[in-house]
Amino acid sequence: MRKFLYRFLLFSLLPLLTFLVLEIRIRTKHTQLFQEEKLEQAFRHKAGAYQWVNTIKHPKKVFLLGSSSIKYGLSCRELNRLAADSLAFINLAADARDPIETYFILKQLDLSAVSAMYMGIDPWIYTRNYYRNRHQYLLLDLPFTKALRYSKDYDLRLFAKRYKALFHFPDPDHPAAILQTSIPADFGSVALTKKPVNFNDPVSKKFRLNEYGWSELQFTYLQKIVSLCQEKGIAFTAFYPPRRMDFINDYESNCRDIQASFLAQLQKSGFTKQIKSSILSLQPGNDSLFADAYHLNKAGQETYSRYFFSFVQEN
């Protein structure tokens, strides 16, 4: 009986010891794990979806960067029509896209004919709370106690994903992008014809800074995008996309401290650009142009594209 209990104890301790060794490695090797070369291994396959960008031969390309608010908020077809072919607008935004993924996509594209980049800023994208929408490699950035909470709140598979990422196993939830060489009808923009189902909560609940905090990595890679533009002689402008009035009221009432903290994080990372406000958000009676508090509908996309083109001309 004693031998059985002894063997059982040894057998039980083996997974626990393995768990402890892996977590100690993640904690002590954090800096090495998040070197640019390491992150590039996780995100290098994302640019395949944008190989069509290199086939556009135009001396003045303008890249639109950001998440879903930019993907659905601006029509490149309308912008190119307004520009009368003097500029070629191209939308590289995607649902929940962050600065890290954006940076590695940009690094793999031909930037020689890009004259300007405009990046929409959604502050909640810069939180660790949003890691649930990211490649599993970013789960290595969560301290152990936050990883435990995340596992309970969002994904019981967290630690399995975390250890797979540690050894660079593929992320089945974020497979390599399919090579795309055909130019999309709206140059990467998409019109939103139905109401999104995952944006019903107030904006003040999207951050969860007390539980997970900001992602310093996102701020670092935002600044890397700025530096890349400076290196290539490309003008860079950051701006806030338009919001519905209920969003604006909620943000002003409940997110003052969050916004102040966000701006402090930007400054800490070396980001000194002024983020331009959205002109459309200031116009009265425009709630009908939104599919929800964050995203413009098709009519809103066309309207905002005209405002945005005027903004580009003035800046």
Model region roles, listed by residue range:
Residues 290-315:
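Histidine-centered active-site loop/cap adjacent to the catalytic His
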Residues 121, 130-232:
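Secreted/periplasmic serine-hydrolase-like ester/acetyl group-modifying domain
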Residues 191, 226-251:
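Active-site segments of SGNH/GDSL-like serine hydrolases
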Residues 26-47:
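Alpha-helical transmembrane signal-anchor/signal-peptide segments
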Residues 244-278:
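Substrate-gating cap/lid alpha-helix
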Residues 58, 63-150:
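Membrane-embedded segments
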Residues 6-27:
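Hydrophobic membrane-insertion alpha-helices, especially the h-region
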